[in-house]
Amino acid sequence: MVCHRYLLGLGASTLCLRRLAQYPSTEYHGIASRHRSPGYYAYILGNFNISNEEQLFSSVHSLANNDSDVLPVEDNGTTNLTGTGEATSETGKEEEVVNEPYNGNRMRNFCIIAHVDHGKSTLADRFLELTKAVEPHEIQGQYLDNMELERERGITIKLQSALIKYTYPKDGQVYSLNLIDTPGHIDFNHEARRSIAACEGAILVVDGTKGIQAQTVTTSMIAIEAGLKLIPVVNKIDVPFCDYESTVADLTSLFDFSEDEILMASAKEGFGINEILDAVVERIPPPKINLDRPFRALVFDSQYDPHRGVVSYVRVSDGIIKKLDDVVFLGHNLESRITAVGVMMPELRERDVLRSGEVGWLCSNTKDPSKVAVGDTVALKSAVKDNNVEPLVAFAPAKPSVFAGLYPCDGSDYMRLSVALEKLKLNDHSIVFEPSESSIAGHGFKCGFNGLLHLDVTVQRLQREFDVGVIVTSPSVPYKCILKNGKEITVSDAAHWPEEGMVKVSMEPWTNVTVRIPGDCHKKVSNLLTQMRGEFQKKSEFAGGKSLVLEYKVPMIEIISTFFDNLKSMTNGFGSFDYEGTEYREIDLCKLRVLINGEEAGGLSMLVARDNAYKSGRLLVETLREVIPPKQFKINLQAAIGKRVIAALSIPALRKNVTERCSGGDPSRKRKLLENQAKGKKYMAEIGNVSIPFDAYKAVHKALR
């Protein structure tokens, strides 16, 4: 019998009570409360053994008729997660776990799909705790989120994998479950796609207090198209305002689930964990086993180890692989010899062999990160020579939606930044970069990202993991323009924009935006999207109008500015959005040049709509006047289109009172001192340099967005 501290949320529905009654022989310890609202008494069934629906309702009505202010509670303060399934071995018997007998029918590969903060990492922690894959004293919040940045932000940035062992109670057999914890933020959707490629099934986790979010729907559709079996789970049912019934209604209408398929859980309290693992065994099919074919595997992730070189995470499709086997990475035709293979538990542990259907890692003593690409196929060398190997389906190339320049704070760190980006791309294949040069920041790279959060995380990883500080220019999107000579080019920054008069037609990217919001926020969010030049497409209602899905077409440049922050603010944190697809529409663009004392500051120039050029130019020079420190000479700030200045301001010179000691006497003496000072300032203005602080880039971007 399983013991749980369990609180079913305020306003629990009849449907929720019926679903709770289906969980077999579960003893619930009570939690005291003074609330007496209908349905709330399902939260506490102190020491009742619940085996059927009739007994459940009898217990609830008994509690409801209790007139005392505080219900009596007996609680030993413990939470037992051992459940009906058991771990196959205690920690310390690592060799038995790693090199266990192989049985493809008792293998399951699955990932967790959920929006940010819906509880997927906490659920993964409960899996590890229940199956004793990790010692209880080692378990900490977000255990699989091993990056310091992930713990600080409370989000998953990198996919993580772990092999866990679970004894299925109905047949007593031990099953190998390969769990992959995936990111939920839209900017890291590429990580979720790679997880899906390595699995046959997925647990779809939805926060019962917030409902289904837009990004969850998008990722789930990708999983369905890939043929994955989904297991729906409503999480956080211990929270008093969990709306279980509405969440179930949304799941059934969006994905055609039956109510019986949907599981309820509280990852925080450990309720429903056994039922989820049982469903993984029962519903997700085992991988296809092809042991008789030559070895072939898909590289779905990788990282760089200073001692081993490139460590590739693979899903083995065919055959077996072991140490000292000769392989070929088909993408770059790289021949190499395997130095080690193993599994993630979740730490990397070596084993003797990897077989068809398994998820693991391999090292080939490759030191060049650029030679091993995520999505590549690795195959046995002998089979490649016999032309007996076809590449597995690779991932679609990354298409960045946001571009920004990264320049080292110290000009001598250019090569260090180059090496750091190469190693980072090994772990995050969606980053694209190419060398660039700025008249202000010097040599650096123009980089492409999936969004502003992706950009921010990359900058912080460069600082923390590689100790390389960078200057970030204002983010932009890829524009297209047709020149008067008929040539079409793509431009992502002002530095590469053609000269004024050469462009015949310019175009900006638009995208399809899906916004999911509470029903009472409809007017505010619609007005926001209209201000962003958005075009309404469709509105859908869920849960009787409590939840709305709005579809708009919006310029990409508007999405990457402050839309996310504004949406969260207007919806009290409950709004979410997703965007996909790109189309180009005509717009009259121009390059807004920034001149400082007559010289162009290329790093601060930007592309703007010609209709807004005068407003943007004025705002730009006003912002620069606030962030550029004054000198002993006058600094002229100008915004120009081509050779025409459209806005101008100046920063007055610092003035020293050279006549301070001339208290009286001939006024010609004072005039002479002032003339000499003026000559000196003129000379300094001719030879002096104006230093632009690093914060100027951020200040300008914030002001114009």
Swiss-Prot record:
Residues 76-90 have a biased composition (Polar residues). GO terms for molecular function: GTP binding; GTPase activity; ribosome binding. SUPFAM superfamilies: EF-G C-terminal domain-like (SSF54980), P-loop containing nucleoside triphosphate hydrolases (SSF52540). It is found in: Mitochondrion inner membrane. The keyword Cell membrane does not apply. It comes from the Eukaryota. It is a peripheral membrane protein. Residues 72-92 are annotated as: Disordered. InterPro entries: EF-4 (IPR006297), EFG_III/V (IPR035647), EFG_V-like (IPR000640), G_TR_CS (IPR031157), LepA_C_sf (IPR038363), LepA_CTD (IPR013842), P-loop_NTPase (IPR027417), Small_GTP-bd (IPR005225). One of its GO terms (cellular component) is mitochondrial inner membrane. Its EC number is 3.6.5.-. PANTHER family: TRANSLATION FACTOR GUF1 HOMOLOG, CHLOROPLASTIC, TRANSLATION FACTOR GUF1-RELATED. Belongs to the TRAFAC class translation factor GTPase superfamily. Classic translation factor GTPase family. LepA subfamily. This is Translation factor GUF1 homolog, mitochondrial. It comes from Babesia bovis.
